[in-house]
């Protein structure tokens, strides 16, 4: 775990610093408080929203899309990029450590170590060391599932509530947690009662908004301000395919590219490629993993894929996938169990063993 954490974060930070040194900071860098090589790689698009909420509270309707636990931690550490990065790094280290323990319960240290490594080197893992809530959500969600898997229902409920106070996706933890309770010995109602804390994280957020004189239902409406609307279950798959097809058409036709930061045609193609790989991993997870883990991945994917974004249906999909560790677990099993895959990634099992020994 320590090796995966240190190596992956060093690579992310070095790459970000090199990019800043070569290309310079974005024109809006001052609003991120990212004024140099040392702190710049920790600030991305949504970082400014988290920082402004930490400093000023929920002033705008669209702010409610960012749930309060991470901004509260930012505020406690000075509402700065440096403080936010430290929070994210600490949460990510804890998440990897706990994830190793969770996976090792069923699959052993080698698979657990490789799973941790794959989570750490996933392309969208850059957000785990940035001023984003991904690290905190990963820690809280893994803690909730670890608690349920080991019979610690108080931990499952409290951590699940913290996950829901971090991101709306915390609500889907009720799917694997409910299944684990159903399969537990005795099915005690007092254990089930702890799971009521999972939606309580959202309830507390709504109550806070009400007490502040703001719309208590803003968390349910905020996605409208970001161009997301319900299509139909997994409707984003079809919309993403259409966007990718249109992007391919534009590129093939040589239409002029006008966006200053990135090319949406290529981005739509890349996002659709991520979707195809993700869906393949979901199928593999359903066939190979415990049902609670695979259903968690399906339920968590259902949220962004059922609420596609206007103009770019699969927006942020890699970031959503980054916290879906069951998909990384499935890939780890493929690498460990199949000789051809093992030869293709020869160093990975030995690295996984070293990670396992250091945990």
Named regions from a protein language model:
Residues 11-29, 41-43, 162, 174-277, ...:
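Membrane-lumen/periplasm interface segments of specific transmembrane helices
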Residues 41-79:
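Short hydrophobic/aromatic helix or loop-helix immediately within or flanking a transmembrane segment
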Residues 64, 68, 72, 78-94, ...:
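Loop-to-helix entry region of an early transmembrane alpha helix in multi-pass inner-membrane enzymes
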Residues 76, 86-106, 277-281:
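Transmembrane-helix motifs of polytopic, lipid-linked glycan transferases
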Residues 93, 106, 113-124, 128-130, ...:
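Transmembrane and membrane-interface helices of multi-pass
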Residues 98-101, 118-121, 136-155, 174-177, ...:
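Specific aromatic-rich, kink-prone transmembrane helix
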Residues 99-121, 155, 290-291, 295:
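Transmembrane-helix signature of polytopic, membrane-embedded enzymes
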Residues 130-136, 317:
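Short acidic/glycine- and proline-prone juxtamembrane loop motifs at membrane-interface regions
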């Amino acid at each position: 775990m320590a090796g995966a954490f240190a190596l992956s974060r060093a690579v992310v930070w070095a790459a970000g610093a090199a990019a800043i040194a070569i290309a310079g900071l974005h024109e809006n860098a001052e609003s991120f408080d990212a004024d140099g090589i040392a702190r710049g790689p920790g600030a991305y698009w949504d970082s400014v929203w988290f920082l402004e909420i930490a400093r000023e509270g929920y002033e705008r309707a669209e702010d409610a899309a960012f749930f309060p636990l991470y901004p509260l931690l930012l505020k406690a550490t000075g509402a700065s990029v440096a403080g936010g990065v430290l929070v994210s790094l600490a949460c990510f280290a804890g998440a990897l450590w706990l994830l190793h323990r969770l996976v090792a319960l069923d699959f052993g240290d080698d698979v657990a170590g490789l799973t941790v490594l794959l989570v750490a080197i996933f392309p969208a893992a850059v957000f785990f060391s940035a001023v984003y809530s991904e690290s905190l959500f990963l820690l809280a969600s893994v803690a909730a599932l670890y608690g349920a898997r080991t019979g610690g229902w108080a931990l499952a409920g409290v951590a699940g509530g913290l996950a829901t106070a971090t991101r709306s996706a915390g609500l889907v933890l009720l799917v694997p947690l409910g299944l684990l309770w159903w399969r537990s010995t005795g099915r005690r109602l007092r254990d089930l009662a702890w799971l009521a804390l999972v939606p309580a994280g959202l309830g507390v957020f709504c109550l806070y908004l009400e007490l502040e004189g703001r719309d208590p239902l803003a968390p349910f409406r905020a996605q409208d301000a970001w161009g997301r609307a319900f299509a139909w279950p997994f409707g984003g798959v079809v919309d993403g395919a259409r966007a990718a097809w249109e992007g391919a058409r534009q590129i093939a036709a040589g239409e002029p590219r006008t966006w200053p930061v990135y090319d949406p045609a290529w981005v739509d193609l890349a996002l659709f490629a991520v979707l195809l790989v993700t869906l393949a991993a979901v199928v593999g997870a359903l066939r190979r993993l415990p049902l609670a883990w695979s259903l968690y991945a399906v339920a968590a994917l259902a949220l962004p894929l059922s609420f596609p974004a206007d103009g770019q249906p699969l927006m942020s999909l890699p970031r959503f996938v980054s916290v879906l560790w069951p998909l990384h677990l499935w890939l780890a099993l493929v690498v460990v169990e199949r000789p051809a895959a093992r030869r293709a990634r020869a160093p990975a099992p030995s690295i996984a063993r070293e990670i396992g020994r250091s945990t």
